[in-house]
């Protein structure tokens, strides 16, 4: 099994994806890496964080092929990495409630790392075009009740395979049983 790299979302850390990791371990998957980045203030641009991710992958992951499971903002960082810095063959990218089409909440932000998450931002349009043209094997999970990526449909990629889960909030969608099942069934293919 190719390794799985976890990337957390804005203001979070490694605890955010532990339930997913625990589920996958129970299913016999044990090859994991965790990218932890400082994002508490939204000061860094996505490109800068994607460069840090690229360095992390280069320095820590020996395997040639990897799968990425990225939560919320982590999904946008992963796409930025794939567009500009890809140094490994990413077989599959799973984004969980990532603001592919922006979030209305970002309209209130002025920090560089959050301004790029506004609906119709230049960055998100560029990443959408990149995903369309590069045919990345992408899987997106979203909930219509997401108040962080608002409205919730903005968290689905227009390309690849989508899974709607009826979790009551943004964080519950990461830990929803249907999310675990969707990831597992598609990662072992």
Regions found by a protein language model. Give the residues of each.
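Serine-dependent carboxylesterase/thioesterase catalytic core
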Residues: 4-8, 15, 25-37, 43, ...
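Short amphipathic alpha-helix
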Residues: 19-20
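C-terminal catalytic-base region of ester-bond hydrolases, centering on the histidine
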Residues: 133-189
């Amino acid at each position: 099994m190719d390794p799985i790299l976890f990337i957390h979302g804005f203001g979070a850390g490694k605890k955010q994806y532990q339930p997913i990791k625990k589920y996958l371990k129970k299913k016999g998957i044990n090859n994991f890496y965790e990218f932890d980045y400082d994002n508490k203030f939204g000061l860094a641009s996505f490109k800068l964080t994607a460069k840090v991710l690229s360095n992390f992958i280069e320095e820590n992951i020996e395997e040639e092929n990897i799968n990425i499971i990225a939560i919320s903002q982590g999904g946008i960082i992963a796409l930025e990495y794939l567009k500009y810095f890809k140094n490994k063959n990413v077989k599959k990218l799973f984004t969980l409630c990532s603001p592919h089409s922006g979030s209305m909440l970002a309209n209130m932000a002025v920090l560089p790392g959050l301004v790029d998450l506004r609906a119709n931002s230049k960055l998100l349009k560029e990443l959408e075009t990149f995903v369309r043209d590069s045919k990345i094997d992408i899987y997106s999970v979203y909930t219509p009740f997401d108040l962080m990526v608002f409205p919730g449909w903005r968290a689905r990629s227009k390309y690849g395979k989508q899974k709607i889960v009826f979790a009551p909030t943004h964080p519950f969608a990461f830990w929803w049983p249907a999310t675990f099942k969707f990831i597992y069934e598609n990662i072992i293919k």
